[in-house]
Amino acid sequence: QYDVGDYYTTPSVTAGSEKRNLVMIYLESGEQTLADDELFEKDAFVPLKEATTAEKGWQSIEDFQQYKGGGWTMAGIVSTQCGIPLKGTGLGGGNSSSGTDARNVGDGDVDTYLGGTTCLGDILQDNGYSNVFMGGASSTFAAKKTFLTGHGYDEVLGLADWRAAGEAEEDFRPDWGLSDERLMANAKDKVDELHAGAKQTGRPFNLSVL
């Protein structure tokens, strides 16, 4: 048992003169095995390796470990967006009881999600960014939309939006949501849209894709 408050430091950010656009892509279940071209048709990470060289250090982080209980979608989102682990029970506010397991809630089950925590979306919003999240699965899964909209995200797109947009049925996985291929195609279009908007308004953007 531990208290996150014993370790938590409120972020202090000084904005630079140049506000760059940010595109963050979550490679859920991505691992080194996908680079083995003897097991697969090709090394899936070639584009990443070309974009950021090994000298940058990202391809091999010594002693890097996933924290206990951190191997599921919302735990990964919270860890990367907020810099804290997501404990299994209690969401830091709202109408959920303290014993509610974070893995079993929907958007209607909580009013707020880690309301006392400063996350990436909060910081970017305070610095004038437009924040957009795109996911292939349902936005209501594990109260994902509640978390995102409560932490600076202006637009959250998920399964219901892709169905409403007329995506072909064969492009959906019955056990999850929109295929990665179609999600990335939509993300590319969204980047173009956000770039055009940024040129008109001068407002930078953050696009997170999972």
Regions found by a protein language model. Name each.
Residues Q1-L210:
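Soluble catalytic regions of membrane-associated enzymes that act on cell-envelope
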